[in-house]
Amino acid sequence: MATAACEPVARPSLTSISSGELRSLWTCDCELALLPLSQLLRLQPGAFQLRGEQLLVPGPGEPAAARGGFNVFGDGLVRLEGQLYRLSSYIKRYVELTNYCDYKDYRETILSKPMVFFINVQTKKDISKERTYAFLVNTRHPKIRRQIEQGMDMVISSVIGESYRLQFDFQEVVKNFFPPGTIVLNGENLSFTYEFKADALFDFFYWFGLSNSTVKVHGKVLNLTSTNPEKKETIKLFLEKMSEPLIRRSSFSDRKFSVTSRGSIDDVFNCNLSPRSSVTEPLLAEFSFPSLLECEETSSQLI
């Protein structure tokens, strides 16, 4: 298909990242990302493992957790290839907090690692096909971190001493990423909520639901789907770098992001890949969306 024919249907959110971009990053310059859960399991066996009827994720007290990893948000179950698996360790999508110490611990915990949410996707053309995706939120990227921190700060300043409920929602950005005709079966999985219950005698705003707020988080979504062995190795390194333990730099010049990862990204991404090649392939290749596939192939050639 000609380039001109692709331009009207090209979508800004359908973004691929080139190998050249990966090699030049200071740290993981990724706001949001999507990839099949099956691919994530293969690329990050230290962080996610299927064992029997469980999807094992290192918990806070396990040695693997000290080396970084991800914060999985969920309700305890994930469906992969038609089978239900129990999550061994996860952060509940709804929590209640009753004091400042709980709030502080919760805030530090959710921002300490990249977030992971699991969703199931179908197409209207073939509802018999269902695929499970992992949605990644890079909490060390300044744009994403700022939206979460500002949301938490603003609600506190507006309800001083009172109870409130705050939800962070990624449904809109994910649904806009997929092409038309795609059905996200469990979109509610793309949000998490905490409720702070203050010991207030008269909590009128809370009683009448006037202190409930929702922050719709927005950002650029990267498609990390790939079947190319060389590109998958690059994505693996990319994910490992994103999930490294966080350390704070003492020098302002070293702190390009509010919190940075350990080590130098340049050492990790010196891969022998063409600077013009694309790391990703069409997100829904098996669902056959011709306009999407052709446009992504064309855009990759133009990078």
Curated annotation (Swiss-Prot):
- Entry keyword Ribonucleoprotein: no
Instruction: Name the predominant localization.
Output: cytoplasm
What GO terms fall under cellular component here? cytoplasm
What biological processes does GO assign it?
Answer: positive regulation of fat cell differentiation
Keyword entries, A-Z: Cytoplasm
Where, by tissue, is this protein expressed?
Highly expressed in white adipose tissue compared with other organs with higher expression in mature adipocyte fraction. Significant expression is also detected in the heart, brain, and pancreas.
InterPro entries in the record: MEDAG/TEX26
Oxidoreductase is among the record's keywords:
no
Q: Where found, per UniProt?
A: Cytoplasm
Under what conditions is it induced?
Down-regulated by estrogen treatment.
- Protein's job: Involved in processes that promote adipocyte differentiation, lipid accumulation, and glucose uptake in mature adipocytes.
Q: What name does this protein carry?
A: Mesenteric estrogen-dependent adipogenesis protein
Name the gene. Medag
